[in-house]
């Protein structure tokens, strides 16, 4: 088994995500375990969202929109067709989170 860990800085943008694919294409897809951290500073950004939630801050929705915008930009850089299912899937998670908060 091959295990690969990609930290947040290594998947902070579309080029980093493409590099993960390159590694998989190089070593193969069988008997591989990937551990991938949150992209870029997403963990920090989500901590801000959570803090805003508990503080009942007026910045709550704006802070969540920043995280959504960041992920959507990466998707736009990776996929030419904005009708690709991945846009729906990722944004559905953000919609669920938005509804929750």
Model-derived features: where do they sit?
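Nucleotide/pyrophosphate-binding catalytic subdomain
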Residues: 1-101
């Amino acid at each position: 088994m091959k295990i690969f860990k990609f930290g947040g800085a290594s998947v902070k943008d579309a080029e980093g995500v493409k590099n993960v694919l390159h590694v998989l294409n190089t070593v193969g897809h069988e008997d591989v375990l990937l551990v991938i951290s949150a992209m870029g500073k997403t963990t920090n950004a989500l901590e801000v969202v959570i803090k805003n939630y508990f503080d009942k801050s007026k910045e709550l929705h704006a802070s969540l929109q920043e995280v959504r915008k960041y992920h959507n930009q990466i998707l736009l850089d990776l996929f030419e067709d904005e009708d690709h299912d991945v846009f729906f899937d990722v944004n559905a998670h953000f919609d669920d989170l938005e509804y929750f908060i």
